[in-house]
Amino acid sequence: MSAIVDIFAREILDSRGNPTVECDVLLESGVMGRAAVPSGASTGQKEALELRDGDKSRYSGKGVLKAVEHVNNQIAQALIGIDASEQSYIDQIMIELDGTENKGNLGANATLAVSMAVARAAAEDAGLPLYRYLGGAGPMSLPVPMMNVINGGEHANNSLNIQEFMIMPVGAKSFREALRCGAEIFHALKKLCDSKGFPTTVGDEGGFAPNLNSHKEALQLMVEATEAAGYKAGEDVLFALDCASSEFYKDGKYHLEAEGRSYTNAEFAEYLESLVNEFPIISIEDGMDENDWEGWKLLTEKLGGKVQLVGDDLFVTNPKILAEGIEKGVANALLVKVNQIGTLSETLKAVDLAKRNRYASVMSHRSGETEDSTIADLAVATNCMQIKTGSLSRSDRMAKYNQLLRIEEELAEAADYPGKAAFYQLGK
């Protein structure tokens, strides 16, 4: 392999027009790896720290020049001369250099930019695509996409508290076919919204953001759009929700403005069960507040045998917190967001821990994205079989889908599309 000879970071803009960190890693062989870091809107309390400048005179305080400086100085000095193939060692050096539990000194946006750029440089130097470099030579699955077609919560300016309403083309025979299915439903939904007088502006993740009267109305729209596109809801396509419940949990209750009601955790679990019974919902993310472990236990006991229950804010891609959740028997799947933990090595450790305990993993973007498509390669490399990367619009979302098309093409007959088998943890 080849040693690192230069590391350089810069401030660029993400899909929301906010600054983020991009990093270039140059090796002595002459190859370069480049990576850019995403940013979330609804964030878990225990996520690794995204370092912002706080200078209100620049980007309303959201600048990342401090993180860039950390990359170009402390991190570069510590890593130059090390072989780029030593990913775990490099990540551990940055963890120790930071010295905090949450990357609070250097910033997770600094460490992650370097970590991903190192992997890209090493893959390029080895003459391998990133998914092969990280995943090895074994069989690989393309992920079933969770396509966010209706946005609510923190991702849209409407009355829906549930943040994401997603379609999953489980009946497709290939990723290419799944992407076509999703695109056709997305365009059918646009026509449907037009016909009902709903605006067809899109939210942060590219889905529509109609001002509906209830969550059931959103789900019914999805059923109608699926059928209008020529597919069967419950057979060809299943639905997934991201409740982002921590955003509407206050004083021990779940407050749904769209429904005009507040619920205890037991009542909210029943409410979610009623949606599952009425609509073909296979996956619910953050169905309870991140600190409501009792609520999570109730929800898991009620729905965990038939519905994928995904911990995002609950686990924040942190192996230690995931281990606690596994021990307590809450949820049955992990949402994987690389910037929640701040290095590739820790991300891969979390996915491995989930697999060993029969928890599914869902590779995920953030609402503030860039054209970086690393998570597409990661989804294939880890065989996690599911990816959540937004709707069928906005080039920051399509970059990931298009990369998966390329990977499927490269793998040819070796590419597997799991469909419903992606939910292997259910009915155990």
UniProtKB/Swiss-Prot annotation:
Chief place where the protein resides: cytoplasm
Q: In which pathway does it act?
A: Carbohydrate degradation; glycolysis; pyruvate from D-glyceraldehyde 3-phosphate: step 4/5
Binding positions (Mg(2+)): 242, 285, 312
Domain of life the protein comes from: Bacteria
For this UniProt record, give its keywords in alphabetical order, as a comma-separated list: Cytoplasm, Glycolysis, Lyase, Magnesium, Metal-binding, Secreted
Identify a single GO molecular function assigned to this protein: magnesium ion binding
Q: Which reaction does it catalyse?
A: (2R)-2-phosphoglycerate = phosphoenolpyruvate + H2O
Binding of (2R)-2-phosphoglycerate occurs at 163, 337, 366-367, 388
Q: Could you say which enzyme class this protein belongs to?
A: lyase
Question: Cofactor binding mode, per the note?
Answer: Binds a second Mg(2+) ion via substrate during catalysis.
Name the catalytic site residues: 205, 337
**SUPFAM superfamilies referenced in this protein's UniProt entry, alphabetically:** Enolase C-terminal domain-like, Enolase N-terminal domain-like
Bridged cysteine pairs (disulfide)? none
Q: Please, one GO biological process term?
A: glycolytic process
Q: Where in the cell is it found?
A: Cytoplasm; Secreted; Cell surface
The cofactors named for this UniProt entry are: Mg(2+)
Coiled-coil residue windows = none
Which GO cellular component term is one of those annotated?
A: cell surface
Please indicate if the UniProt record lists Lipid metabolism as a keyword.
Answer: no
Which HAMAP family does the UniProt entry name for this protein? Enolase (MF_00318)
The record's section on NCBIfam families has: eno
- UniProt record similarity statement: Belongs to the enolase family.
| Designated name of the protein | Enolase
